[in-house]
Regions:
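Membrane-embedded alpha-helical bundles that constitute the cytochrome b-like, heme-associated redox core
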Residues: 1-242
C-alpha cells in the first residue's frame, strides 16, 4: 500500500483550534458553576470572581475567534473560507458525491473538510460567534467590563455616583429604575447565551463523535493532523491539488 502525505492545516489554524478547545472547555466549566451558583450556595463575592474568570477566558476566546475569521481570508488553501463555507464552485457535486459514497459504504477522502464537514464547521463557527457576541454584552451588563461596561455603568449609575464606582451586586451605586430597564433589555441576551450553552454542548458532542467515527471507519489522521498539519491517504483525496 502506497501512502501519500499531504499538507493541510497551517500553524495558525492548528493554534486556533487547540486554543479554542481550551477556551471552550474553560468557559463551559466555569459557566456550569455560574448556572448552578445559587444551588451551590455561592455568595455574591464568589459569583463576581466566577463571572470575572469567565469573562477573561471569554476575551481570549473572542480574540482567537476574530483571528480565525481574518485567517479565513489570508491563510493556507484549506483554511480559507472558500474551502470551509458550504457553497461555491463544485460544492454541490462534491456534496452529492459524499452522500452517494455514504449510502454505498465507500470512503471518499478529503485533505480539508468534507462537504458535510463544511456544513458542520460553518454551523459551529456561527454558534461560537453568537456566543462570543452575547458574552461581551453580558460582561458589560453584569460586571461593567469592556467593551460595553463603561457605557452601561454611565446609564445606570445613581445620582451623584461616578460611573467608575458602579459595582456588581452593589444596589446602592445604581439608579433602581435605570438598572431595572437595563436588566429588562438584557433578558433576551441572557436567554440566548444560556440556550447557546446547551446548543454548543450538543454541537461539540456531535463533532467529537463524527471525528471519531470517521477515523475508525476511513482513517485520514483527522486528530493527528491538527497537531502535525498533515494527513496521510492510501488513495488520492477528492480535493488534492492539481
Amino acid at each position: 500500500m502506497n501512502l501519500q502525505e499531504y499538507k493541510v492545516w497551517d500553524a495558525s489554524t492548528r493554534i486556533f483550534h487547540w486554543l479554542n478547545v481550551l477556551c471552550v472547555l474553560g468557559l463551559i466549566a466555569v459557566g456550569t458553576v455560574i448556572l448552578k451558583a445559587d444551588a451551590l450556595g455561592v455568595p455574591n463575592d464568589g459569583k463576581v470572581i466566577l463571572k470575572t474568570t469567565h469573562v477573561w477566558i471569554g476575551y481570549v476566546f473572542v480574540l482567537n475567534l476574530l483571528w480565525r475569521l481574518v485567517w479565513g481570508f489570508i491563510g493556507g488553501p484549506y483554511a480559507r473560507w472558500r474551502a470551509i463555507l458550504p457553497f461555491g464552485r463544485g460544492y454541490g457535486t462534491q456534496f452529492a458525491g459524499e452522500l452517494s459514497a455514504i449510502r454505498e459504504g465507500r470512503a471518499v477522502n478529503y485533505i480539508g473538510h468534507t462537504p458535510l464537514g463544511r456544513i458542520a464547521v460553518t454551523v459551529l463557527l456561527g454558534a461560537l460567534i453568537l456566543q462570543g457576541a452575547t458574552g461581551l454584552i453580558l460582561a458589560g451588563t453584569d460586571l461593567y467590563m469592556p467593551p460595553f461596561g463603561k457605557t452601561i455603568a454611565a446609564n445606570v449609575a445613581a445620582s451623584g455616583v461616578d460611573p467608575s464606582q458602579v459595582r456588581p451586586y452593589a444596589p446602592e451605586t445604581v439608579d433602581p429604575e435605570a438598572y431595572k430597564a437595563m436588566r429588562d433589555k438584557r433578558a433576551p441576551v441572557v436567554e440566548t447565551h444560556e440556550l447557546r450553552y446547551f446548543v454548543l454542548l450538543g454541537l461539540i458532542t456531535l463533532h467529537i463523535l463524527a471525528v471519531a467515527l470517521t477515523e475508525l471507519r476511513h482513517g485520514g489522521n483527522i486528530v493527528s493532523a491538527m497537531f502535525s498539519g498533515r494527513k496521510t491517504f492510501a488513495n488520492p483525496p477528492a480535493d488534492r491539488p492539481n
